[in-house]
Amino acid sequence: MSEQNLVCGRLSGLFGMAKRAGRLAAGFDASVGTLVTRKAYAIFRAADASDKTVKEISFALQRHGSTLSLGELPLTKRQLGDALGTPKPVGVVALTDKGFATAVGKLLDLPAD
């Protein structure tokens, strides 16, 4: 199994656990809601999210004074939706738990806060 497939599998598992734990907001509106309430520790977009989605979520980050940056996942919208157990593709997710956010950041080799 390639390293990319291994990372994608682990990310899918982490996002699934975070959703079951109630620590994940799936979709654009839910993710922006976590920014408004300042509950988000990390926000990510699918690899194939549209330019419009990226632009709007980046604008929402700025508008709400968030210090978070938008991370890109190696998962497609379909893969992300499957990981969350939804029949629909999901382009944006926010994590509301520092532990899950840290674990995903480590898998993606992102700098820690």
Where are the language model's segments positioned?
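Catalytic cores of RNA-modifying enzymes
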Residues: 1-9, 19, 99-102, 109
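N-terminal first-folded block
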Residues: 7-45
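Amphipathic alpha-helical interface surfaces
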Residues: 11, 27, 31, 39, ...
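Short active-site oxyanion
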Residues: 21-22, 40-42, 65-70, 91
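N-terminal positively charged helical leader segments and presequences
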Residues: 36-64
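Short secondary-structure boundary segments
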Residues: 47, 73, 97
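Mid-chain, well-packed structural core segment of small domains
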Residues: 59-89
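C-terminal structural segments of small proteins and small subunits
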Residues: 81-111
